[in-house]
Amino acid sequence: MKVRPSVKPICEKCKVIRRRGKVMIICENPKHKQRQG
């Protein structure tokens, strides 16, 4: 899980979701997991 000020989809399988007001990226590739800090 990467915590970044700006999250962007890295590949086509990355999905942008919102959980408890936080923007997150979920993907098949675990390296692509991000959340906005």
From Swiss-Prot:
HAMAP family: Ribosomal_bL36. It comes from Geobacillus kaustophilus (strain HTA426). SUPFAM superfamilies: Ribosomal protein L36 (SSF57840). One of its GO terms (molecular function) is structural constituent of ribosome. PANTHER family: 50S RIBOSOMAL PROTEIN L36, CHLOROPLASTIC, LARGE RIBOSOMAL SUBUNIT PROTEIN BL36C. One of its GO terms (biological process) is translation. This is Large ribosomal subunit protein bL36. The keyword Ribosomal protein applies. Belongs to the bacterial ribosomal protein bL36 family. It comes from the Bacteria. The lineage of its organism: Bacteria, Bacillati, Bacillota, Bacilli, Bacillales.
